[in-house]
Amino acid sequence: MRADMTLPWWAWAMMAAGLAVFIAMLAISIRRHGGIRRPLFASPYALWMILFTVLPVILIGYYAFTDASGAFTLDNFRSFWDSNFESNKVILDAMGEAGAAYVSRGTVNVDTLGYSLWMAFECTLICLALGYPAALFMADREMKLGPTLVVLFIIPMWMNFLLRTIAWMSLLEDSGLINMLLKALGFQGVQLMYNSGAVLLGMVYNFLPFMVFPIYTVLSKMDFRLSEAAADLGCNSLQTLYKVTVPLSLPGVISGITMVFMPSVTTFFIPRVLGGGNTMMFGDLIESKFLTEGNWNVGSALSLIMMLLILVSLSILRKADPNGEGGGIA
């Protein structure tokens, strides 16, 4: 844990300014609505956002651009592409031969980010390939199975995310259910754990509902008379799907892609449990900087880089779905 938690005067001033802005906004809202009742209901949310979103971002920004003594520096960002930088030695030493390979290429953080982006891309693509047909089936009014399937998708989400991930170990490990069945059928056991495939499986399992529900929300609100009109004009089912249904459901698709891609890039528990430490994603890297090394400065710099990626993803969502019709988990 970081020993020096002393903040400069300007950091305290920025936090005080944020609190002052909150009080001013509350006062203006009370004056505008002619009473305190409505603004009072909104004030807990505004205060929560300031305390747990705005102020943490200010602190991360402070640590990202300072060293341990509080002096301004850009070395924290330099460590992102320089594996020989001092702050990377702890992780590289723990990785052994793999760490030595990163040193020879000088790209431990860049490679980790690239691997995370690739895994997130694969996860998003698989979730889209599985989620769109599922959402289409759920929204089919003739089948009348939509509410039942929604419940079936929601029930696993009632269980803790960590427990759902750990549960896969009992299926994939060498003495797990799958290998037991293979051996009972006369086949040799296979290595299903501690590789990228297991990590990808865990990611798809956990994030698939975040792809299904936005698409289902949009499809369930779609006027299906448009599909009937397309059929009357001579379109077959496949043509109706690509010319009518898919274009109208794009807001949900974009929303689902964003909701799956962002947590996929930042996840760190799934690679640790199902990857067994053989795979490292960007979330693992940030977590190790904060908790293992206690290096809040470099960890904050890496967090800012991740925030930038998230902002880019959100901007793409905003551009593709300007009216916010993508839906969500309702």
Residue ranges, per PLM feature:
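Interhelical loop and adjacent transmembrane-helix boundary motif
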Residues: 2-10, 71-88, 268, 272-322
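Short membrane-interfacial helix/loop motifs at transmembrane-helix boundaries
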Residues: 47-109, 171-175, 276, 328-330
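Transmembrane-helix boundary motif in ABC transporter permease subunits
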Residues: 20-34, 121-154, 227, 319
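N-terminal signal-anchor/first transmembrane alpha helix
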Residues: 2-62, 137, 147-151
